[in-house]
Amino acid sequence: MSSNNSGLSAAGEIDESLYSRQLYVLGKEAMLKMQTSNVLILGLKGLGVEIAKNVVLAGVKSMTVFDPEPVQLADLSTQFFLTEKDIGQKRGDVTRAKLAELNAYVPVNVLDSLDDVTQLSQFQVVVATDTVSLEDKVKINEFCHSSGIRFISSETRGLFGNTFVDLGDEFTVLDPTGEEPRTGMVSDIEPDGTVTMLDDNRHGLEDGNFVRFSEVEGLDKLNDGTLFKVEVLGPFAFRIGSVKEYGEYKKGGIFTEVKVPRKISFKSLKQQLSNPEFVFSDFAKFDRAAQLHLGFQALHQFAVRHNGELPRTMNDEDANELIKLVTDLSVQQPEVLGEGVDVNEDLIKELSYQARGDIPGVVAFFGGLVAQEVLKACSGKFTPLKQFMYFDSLESLPDPKNFPRNEKTTQPVNSRYDNQIAVFGLDFQKKIANSKVFLVGSGAIGCEMLKNWALLGLGSGSDGYIVVTDNDSIEKSNLNRQFLFRPKDVGKNKSEVAAEAVCAMNPDLKGKINAKIDKVGPETEEIFNDSFWESLDFVTNALDNVDARTYVDRRCVFYRKPLLESGTLGTKGNTQVIIPRLTESYSSSRDPPEKSIPLCTLRSFPNKIDHTIAWAKSLFQGYFTDSAENVNMYLTQPNFVEQTLKQSGDVKGVLESISDSLSSKPHNFEDCIKWARLEFEKKFNHDIKQLLFNFPKDAKTSNGEPFWSGAKRAPTPLEFDIYNNDHFHFVVAGASLRAYNYGIKSDDSNSKPNVDEYKSVIDHMIIPEFTPNANLKIQVNDDDPDPNANAANGSDEIDQLVSSLPDPSTLAGFKLEPVDFEKDDDTNHHIEFITACSNCRAQNYFIETADRQKTKFIAGRIIPAIATTTSLVTGLVNLELYKLIDNKTDIEQYKNGFVNLALPFFGFSEPIASPKGEYNNKKYDKIWDRFDIKGDIKLSDLIEHFEKDEGLEITMLSYGVSLLYASFFPPKKLKERLNLPITQLVKLVTKKDIPAHVSTMILEICADDKEGEDVEVPFITIHL
């Protein structure tokens, strides 16, 4: 066995800077289990290498590959690590080095022979792909099943594919879904065990879940850690069984879901062939799984009869033979189709026609799916697929009227695209090559998209091209899933490196891919102008935020360009296809906004760790960013105070922060330590004592109910303890960040901070005693008026603050350095401070603390990500891409997809049709239609045109936020405007010139129809 010598992470350690986004998908326990797993992949055509790529990126102990067959030109259709120079060499040997580059922690080996099946004992998971015969798969599976080795099989043929999973007689699933354990506050527990949620909060539980309780008063025995099985009664209540013998419920209580491991049993491949268990990939094709189950078996039988050759492309003789084989199998395996179900000859014929094809989108779909099943097999995380799944995308085939498929048009032409030509035909391949496309973003989805496009040959023709843009640069945390990038690329521009990488994959793209580093938005409309958008065939988003997606979507609607949209969140992924005049747009439906945390909860009444983390991040922002920026503005902007006094925000807080920052400037690092220690006392001791002074622990509401009940947890002040890890790190990180603000050298070697050095400074400090403020009011509910709202300008307190500020002229040249929050730098103290600060506040309120990783996830608003989902989702997008190139107009041919690989779940639906409107008996598309006006028309002529040609009386006309015309304008204003061309009118009203790059303008109108009724109508596009 040959191998590479790669660096291994130490046992029990995970490189969080590399795996950070994946850790939030799998968790540390699963990652550590993966690091003890050796994986073998048999077959390194497109499917095998896609699986291997995703598994190596994920980080297993080792990867071994086996494929001694020589590289052929047609392999380049889907095997992205092969080049024409590799033709004739062994696929395994050539691919190993490329796989090894993906992850320095995963050694990649080549298995030299498969003659002795017992050598498989060294592996925990074996994956057999489409180069392995069914007979050999059965033999290998029998050995694996009896030896406790997890076995997975998969193969793709044209637009068809399947996978099979056998994880043995007894496999333990540790976490079926991967979702965060649900938790909630209880308002009541009845004797029969009915648990009711507090404040109409949904519990989110399902029948059969298990929960444990804490902080229940009255039913104290519930708090002993016992697990209770849940029976759901509704969204706000569930039952746990009788609790009569436990006593009587008084108040309080928190439930927490507990994931209980469960065992699953799998059957062998031999058993499953005749009596399969299916996971359905598309419920609209419910009946196809059984047909394809027989069809794929028949393909293997055909190959045995024909010296390993699969049916010839579009050959009816071979197709009829395959149908006969399937018919015979249906008799031998009657359980598969079931009684009275005939063989679907059209489906089997299509399988025969495409058997020699290899399509990047299908390969990417199964490559992501199977790789995730490998990770499940290694870790026990998520629910395995049980046991067969079949998939097809026959809707992707082009219209035979436009692109006829026959033996002649699908024959190989000695091209790297031959396996794609076998499915779609040569003419369609030419149309793919001559497409003009725009990819927005080259991160995880963008890299996968470009890889697939390189394999497709998209944009490689004489009339085709690809434009990709991304204004981001490569970071180490990207390398775990953005596979076109290597460690040497860190710091470089994503789009440029990605473009260079795919040109190396497919030299046909050289000179055909234009990499830009410009953000797509209103500020770059001079770059991405009218002529740019109008030249495109379609657009693909590879973005990670809603605002950018929405902007691109609006551009595509305006220019009537198809848009392929997709996104991932951990193991979840979605795809959406947007077609002009056919479907709704991305912006037509929006996710509900995130539920914000009430300010009163943050300020005074937190009850879970999310609240304390949000509070700590806000404190970080105030201490180290806002204060420094306010000081700098005060010192450089002469009218800063005057402008601040006019604002409705926290004027007093702004002025206090400036005063404190300038009057208490530290002179050395010891001063920074003292500042941090005093802030600890203020935030975690004095402020809590003040809160309890206002609302003692025995306080009652106006209704006579205990004030500290329900979601309000009575806090306790903290006494500083330098040997408490959170207390100490609040001071360490706080002092270091304050030193950064003031340009003071901190005690910031990367070594562990010395407790004794900090202690010697703190021991000599005088910590002020707490004195309650009887005049301080604390807001209890967000709906209540803020009792400490800003005093009016000119009040004594504000005047004193203003007069206390030093004259900026006495501080000429002085400047503070604001801290710019960066979550992924473990040496900058940012997450260290927020973690310590949040945990100290959690200790105040008896909330379970969180480690650095969880704090970073919440404070940094990190999106969990893993290469497997990205690969699968991109595959689905590329199957829709063929339909765009074919200009399909039947909405039923398109598919929007939602997947969750953790369950696993696959859902496909037709896109929602665009909404239609009507005026004066004229129907129009509310999204895609508009009134097109050519030339810089006069306002009066525009009004007349609508009256004569559309039967509409324009009552208002606007450009952006500027009102150009209204029927109620005074006669003088109307006279002034009616004779102006639109461009001059816009200039007059906005007092701005029309930019030179603008050749189209959008005008919004309000209009009355012939009956004088106000009607909704499309916008106007003026083509200059």
Curated annotation (Swiss-Prot):
Give the matching NCBIfam families. Ube1 (TIGR01408)
Give the consequence of mutating residue 914 to P: Strongly reduces formation of the thioester intermediate with ubiquitin
Q: Where is this cross-link: Glycyl lysine isopeptide (Lys-Gly) (interchain with G-Cter in ubiquitin)?
A: 595, 608
The record's section on InterPro entries has:
E1_4HB (IPR032420), E1_FCCH (IPR032418), E1_FCCH_sf (IPR042302), ThiF/MoeB/HesA (IPR045886), ThiF_NAD_FAD-bd (IPR000594), Ub-activating_enz_E1_C (IPR018965), Ub-E1_IAD_1 (IPR042449), UBA_E1_C_sf (IPR038252)
Q: Which SUPFAM superfamilies match?
A: Activating enzymes of the ubiquitin-like proteins
The annotated consequence of residue 21 to A reads: Impairs ATPase activity
Pathway(s) per entry? Protein modification; protein ubiquitination
| Protein name, entry field | Ubiquitin-activating enzyme E1 1
Where do the annotations place Mg(2+) 2 binding? Answer: 544
Q: Which cysteines are joined by disulfide bonds?
A: none
Cellular location(s): Cytoplasm; Nucleus
One of the GO BP terms on file: DNA damage response
Native source organism of the sequence: Saccharomyces cerevisiae (strain ATCC 204508 / S288c) (Baker's yeast)
The record's similarity note reads: Belongs to the ubiquitin-activating E1 family.
Q: Which Pfam families match?
A: E1_4HB, E1_FCCH, E1_UFD, ThiF, UBA_E1_SCCH
Task: Indicate yes or no for the key word Transmembrane helix.
Answer: no
Complex and partners:
Monomer. Binds two ubiquitin chains simultaneously. Component of the RSP5-UBA1-UBC5 ubiquitin ligase complex composed of E3 RSP5, E1 UBA1 and E2 UBC5. Interacts with the E2 ubiquitin-conjugating enzyme UBC4.
Coarse class of the primary localization is cytoplasm
Q: Please list the residues that bind ATP.
A: 21, 444, 470, 478, 481-482, 494, 520, 545
Query: Which EC number(s) does the record attach to this protein?
Result: 6.2.1.45
For this protein, the record's SMART domains field holds: UBA_e1_C
- The gene that this protein is the product of is UBA1
The record's account of how the chain is modified after translation: The N-terminus is blocked.
Q: Which reaction does it catalyse?
A: ATP + ubiquitin + [E1 ubiquitin-activating enzyme]-L-cysteine = AMP + diphosphate + S-ubiquitinyl-[E1 ubiquitin-activating enzyme]-L-cysteine
Q: Name one GO cellular component term.
A: cytoplasm
Which branch of life, at top level? Eukaryota
Chain residue ranges for the region called 2 approximate repeats: 27-579
Which parts of the sequence bind Mg(2+) 1? 472, 475
